[in-house]
Swiss-Prot record:
Family classification: Belongs to the invertebrate defensin family. Type 2 subfamily.
Keyword check for Endoplasmic reticulum: no
InterPro entries: Defensin_invertebrate/fungal, Scorpion_toxin-like_sf
Cellular localization per UniProt: Secreted
Keywords tagged on the record: Antibiotic, Antimicrobial, Cleavage on pair of basic residues, Defensin, Disulfide bond, Immunity, Innate immunity, Secreted, Signal
Keyword Signal: yes
SUPFAM superfamilies: Scorpion toxin-like
Tissue expression remark: Expressed in the hemocytes, fat body and ovaries.
Source species of the chain: Rhipicephalus microplus
GO biological process: defense response to Gram-negative bacterium; defense response to Gram-positive bacterium; innate immune response
Protein's recorded name: Defensin
Source species taxonomy: Eukaryota, Metazoa, Ecdysozoa, Arthropoda, Chelicerata
Gene Ontology cellular component terms for the protein in this record: extracellular region
Gene3D superfamilies: Knottin, scorpion toxin-like
Position of the signal peptide: 1-21
Amino acid sequence: MRGIYICLVFVLVCGLVSGLADVPAESEMAHLRVRRGFGCPFNQGACHRHCRSIRRRGGYCAGLIKQTCTCYRN
């Protein structure tokens, strides 16, 4: 029984270590999502301008009913 617990702890620690080692580079990171609003869902241009103001390339309304302004970098 003690061996099973040791194996379980070992597997959990290995999973945590492998998860921490898989941090993406900055160029591989996902789009920046900002809080709701900034024109979404009815004025996508306001979202785009907001993203440009925070030095992103642009933005669009995303989500289930386009309520979240999502900025893209490249």
